[in-house]
């Protein structure tokens, strides 16, 4: 008799994706982050669901409802901080997952990579709208500043912004629709993640060497299921330390002040995971130019397969490209730091240089370095 997991129509799909899946024998811990992202997503949906049971999306009661969750709901404060810091863990895993893809040339799986970029945009949109919901000062002004960027679009910009706001300013209509979108988008993300996985399983996983591993596969279970569980335990440990010891470490104190349209906070800034893009936006004095640079900073990922000039897929055996990759990482950390600083003398020029370097490394230095490496190896 055939095993039920191999014959049952539903179990068969799960079996082929997570149990009997042939996986390369040499994938390192950098390959753990896909499963960690899946765990993060499920976790965020569950905590978000419980928060939505007590939250009200009205400008007069939104702030109070979040306070009520933290004070009066049983373990409401834990759920709230798990959800807020869970978003930070989500983005840490996302950035590492994308970085791994860049380093090991995983972007050569075109469909998987492009759906991944769409996923990144969707997660960023979801996180932004979630940040607006507590209706604190930074929520309100963050929503105002970021949505206002669309007014830079020629001709239709102003109409577009007012259409998104549902009025002439960020108000009740904006908060209600942001809550609706914030609730529905995680399910869209789940669907996209399934498609992402579907395309990945068409080609099979990449591995650190970038060489085909068809002749050396091992079953996903028990080897990688166990490895993923270990990764998940590490992530949960970090998340719990964050939530139970310093839940507000990554937040902004201004968000504990109820939203006031008449009082602008001295430094408007988004959550830490958007600071690199915010720094690129601010480094260009022109509004439209800044918006284009902001979009390009993420959209540039789609160009990666076209910018790949090396004869080797992975950076494992390309020391010059490795140096550039880690320069890019350092540059992104610098941009993240700059994004959180006020717009004054040393920070403006540092931000502008870091922004130029970001695009320069990806568009110019990496492709040229790859050609040099090809010539060094007489390829």
UniProtKB/Swiss-Prot annotation:
Pfam families: Cytochrom_B_C, Cytochrome_B. Its cofactor is heme b. Its main location: mitochondrion. GO terms for biological process: mitochondrial electron transport, ubiquinol to cytochrome c. It is a multi-pass membrane protein. Keywords: Electron transport, Heme, Iron, Membrane, Metal-binding, Mitochondrion, Mitochondrion inner membrane, Respiratory chain, Transmembrane, Transmembrane helix, Transport, Ubiquinone. One of its GO terms (cellular component) is respiratory chain complex III. Heme b b566 binds at residues 97, 196. Heme b b562 binds at residues 83, 182. Binds 2 heme b groups non-covalently. InterPro entries: Cyt_b/b6_C (IPR005798), Cyt_b/b6_C_sf (IPR036150), Cyt_b/b6_N (IPR005797), Cytb/b6-like_sf (IPR027387), Cytochrome_b (IPR030689), Cytochrome_b_C_euk/bac (IPR048260), Cytochrome_b_N_euk/bac (IPR048259), Di-haem_cyt_TM (IPR016174). The chain crosses the membrane at residues 33-53, 77-98, 113-133, 178-198, 226-246, 288-308, 320-340, 347-367. Belongs to the cytochrome b family. Component of the ubiquinol-cytochrome c reductase complex (complex III or cytochrome b-c1 complex) that is part of the mitochondrial respiratory chain. The b-c1 complex mediates electron transfer from ubiquinol to cytochrome c. Contributes to the generation of a proton gradient across the mitochondrial membrane that is then used for ATP synthesis. The cytochrome bc1 complex contains 11 subunits: 3 respiratory subunits (MT-CYB, CYC1 and UQCRFS1), 2 core proteins (UQCRC1 and UQCRC2) and 6 low-molecular weight proteins (UQCRH/QCR6, UQCRB/QCR7, UQCRQ/QCR8, UQCR10/QCR9, UQCR11/QCR10 and a cleavage product of UQCRFS1). This cytochrome bc1 complex then forms a dimer. Heme 1 (or BL or b562) is low-potential and absorbs at about 562 nm, and heme 2 (or BH or b566) is high-potential and absorbs at about 566 nm. This is Cytochrome b. It comes from Potamochoerus larvatus (Bushpig).
């Amino acid at each position: 008799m055939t095993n039920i997991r191999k014959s049952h129509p539903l179990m068969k799909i799960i079996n082929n994706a997570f149990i009997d899946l042939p996986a390369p024998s040499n994938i390192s811990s950098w390959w753990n982050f896909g499963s960690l992202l899946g765990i993060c997503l499920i976790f965020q949906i569950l905590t978000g669901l419980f928060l939505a049971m007590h939250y009200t999306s009205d400008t007069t009661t939104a702030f109070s409802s979040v306070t009520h969750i933290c004070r009066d709901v049983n373990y409401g404060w834990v759920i709230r901080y798990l959800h807020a810091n869970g978003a930070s863990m989500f983005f840490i895993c996302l950035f590492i997952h994308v970085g791994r893809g860049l380093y090991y040339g995983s972007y050569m799986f075109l469909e998987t990579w492009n759906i991944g970029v769409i996923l990144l945009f969707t997660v960023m949109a979801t996180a932004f709208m979630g940040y607006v919901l507590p209706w604190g000062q930074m929520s309100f002004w963050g929503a105002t500043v970021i949505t206002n960027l669309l007014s830079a679009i020629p001709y239709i910009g102003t109409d577009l912004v007012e259409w998104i706001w549902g009025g002439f300013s960020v108000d009740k209509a904006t908060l209600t629709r942001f809550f609706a979108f914030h609730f529905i988008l995680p399910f869209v993300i789940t669907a996209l993640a399934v498609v992402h996985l579907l395309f990945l399983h068409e080609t099979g996983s990449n591995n650190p060497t970038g060489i085909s591993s068809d002749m050396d596969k091992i079953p996903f279970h028990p080897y990688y299921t166990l490895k993923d569980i270990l990764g998940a335990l590490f992530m949960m440990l970090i998340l719990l330390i964050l939530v139970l010891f310093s839940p507000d470490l990554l937040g902004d104190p201004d968000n504990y002040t109820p939203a006031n349209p008449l009082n602008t906070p001295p430094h408007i800034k988004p959550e830490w995971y958007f600071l690199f893009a915010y720094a690129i936006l601010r480094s260009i004095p022109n509004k439209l130019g800044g918006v284009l640079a902001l979009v390009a900073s993420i959209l540039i990922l789609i160009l990666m397969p076209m910018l790949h000039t090396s004869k080797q897929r992975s950076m494992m055996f390309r020391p010059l490209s490795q140096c550039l990759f880690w320069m890019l990482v350092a540059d992104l950390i610098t941009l993240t730091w700059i994004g959180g600083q006020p717009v004054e003398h040393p920070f403006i020029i540092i931000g502008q240089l870091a922004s130029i370097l970001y695009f320069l490394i990806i568009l110019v230095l990496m492709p040229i370095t790859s050609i040099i490496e090809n010539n060094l190896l007489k390829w």
